[in-house]
Design a protein with these regions (language model features):
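Acidic donor-binding segment of Leloir-type glycosyltransferases
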Residues: 95-143
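N-terminal membrane-anchoring/stem segments of glycan-assembly enzymes
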Residues: 15-71, 361, 388
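Cell-envelope/extracellular polymer assembly enzymes that use nucleotide-activated donors
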Residues: 76-78, 108
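Long helical/loop segments within the catalytic core of UDP-sugar-dependent glycosyltransferases
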Residues: 131-138, 143-148, 152, 156, ...
Length: 404
């Protein structure tokens, strides 16, 4: 055997002996219970680091420019907005932000008003004098025959004059004047475009927790979208072509009032036809309509579609949140019941995980335009497992408003 090979063999034996001695030391001092606890904690930490460094790292490091071009320039687009209430504040503020977008190609905004207020509809039509590219369509409200968002969107898509469609809602406003430009240019690299939607920043801890929850939930589907396994997008900020829409005969799951941004997308999304706009100026900002009760109700309502998600997507979410929860519980067990040096080791593992988590959260926040993330993130990190547990428990009961 050559001298170098002998030296490597001796080094391997030395390392193996040291490892065995260390394991024997742990077993002798902490018993099999302590050894098992240590192994479980290390395994859970490894799972957590894999998700936050590798899986979510794809979001932070994603570059849409690496995807193949299918168009040489941004296309003409139609922005579809369903409207189910007489929100005069929307006409005075958020609609102006939509109409004032800077976009090199022609664009139109199609508002589908579902209601019975003729004065409001007239006000909408009067806006066309100021904005010639505004198209207004009305569906008469009838309490005996409720109109769903999908039905309103279908009318809007048929009314649109352009092939490329962008869907948003009256609850959201663009983060910048370049929102439409960012989304439109993304059509150059895919027939489906996905954008991020933030929650409107406000003062207070509740708003912070809701904002971080939105970012975390979005990270789940963004991580799969950038890895060419799209299963959903933001209902306030996504686009597709008319050809794709009519190619599958429109929206599915018509017995549900939700699903346009996930169940429909699952039918049309392929590995090579999705473009992801991950820049702050391409985001939308959703208005926060309430506190934590509103947010949990929001998760419950749209969580009705969760059962129809691909197994791989559901398993990934549950493994991540499950491993986080178990890691916290095993670490707490170590901190309460184990000797001082074991407690110190558990604390080091907790700190190691948190550093990885907060650094990744900050890098993703930078990509999507979320601000003020890092300093209070430990609060959300502790609270999130409980919030997700409550959301899963609530999903065991059917939300009748999500079904027709």
């Amino acid at each position: 055997m050559p001298f170098d090979a002998k030296r490597v063999s001796l080094q391997n034996r030395f390392i193996l002996n040291k490892v065995m001695q260390y394991i024997d030391y742990i077993v002798q001092h902490y018993g099999w219970q302590g050894t098992t606890l240590a192994v479980v904690m290390l395994t859970l930490l490894a799972i957590q680091l894999y998700y936050h460094i590798v899986v979510y790292g794809r979001v932070a490091n994603f570059r849409n420019s690496r995807r193949r071009k299918i168009l040489d320039s941004e296309p003409a687009v139609s922005v579809i907005i369903p409207m189910f209430s007489e929100d005069y504040n929307y006409l005075d503020t958020r609609l102006h932000d939509i109409m004032g977008q800077q976009y090199a190609a022609p664009f139109e905004v199609v508002i589908v008003y579902v209601g019975s207020d003729n004065d409001y509809f007239e006000e909408l039509n009067n806006m066309r004098l100021r904005y010639p590219n505004l198209v207004v369509t009305k569906i008469q409200y009838n309490p005996r025959f409720p109109i769903s968002v999908k039905m309103a969107l279908n009318v809007g898509i048929k009314s649109a004059h352009n092939e490329h469609i962008i869907i948003t809602t009256s609850d959201a406003t663009p983060a910048s004047e370049q929102w439409l430009s960012t989304m439109g240019k993304s059509f150059k690299r895919g027939d489906i475009v996905l954008g991020y939607t933030a929650i409107e920043p406000q003062s207070g801890l509740t708003n912070y927790l809701i904002r971080m929850s939105r970012m975390q939930i979005s990270t789940y589907w963004l991580a799969r979208a950038v890895n060419r396994s799209t299963y959903r997008g933001s209902r306030h900020n996504f686009g597709f072509t008319k050809s794709l829409y009519f190619g599958v005969k429109g929206f599915t799951h018509l017995n549900m009032t939700i699903g346009e941004n996930d169940l429909f997308l699952q039918r049309i999304a392929k590995r090579n036809n999705v473009s992801v706009a991950l820049v702050p100026k391409g985001a939308m900002i959703e208005k926060q309509w309430g506190g934590m009760k509103w947010w949990m109700s929001h998760l419950h309502h749209f969580g009705e579609a969760y059962r129809f998600y691909p197994n791989a997507a559901r398993n990934a979410m549950e493994w991540e949140i499950g491993s986080q929860t178990l890691f916290f519980l095993t670490s707490l067990t170590a901190l309460i019941f184990m000797p001082l040096e074991f407690k110190a080791a558990a604390l080091i593992l907790l700190i190691t995980r948190y550093i990885a988590v907060v650094l990744r959260a900050r890098s993703i926040a930078k990509r999507v335009g979320e601000k003020g993330v890092a300093l209070k993130y430990f609060i959300f990190d502790l609270f999130n497992p409980l919030m997700m547990l409550c959301a899963r428990i609530s999903m065991m009961s059917k939300d009748s408003t999500a079904w027709k």
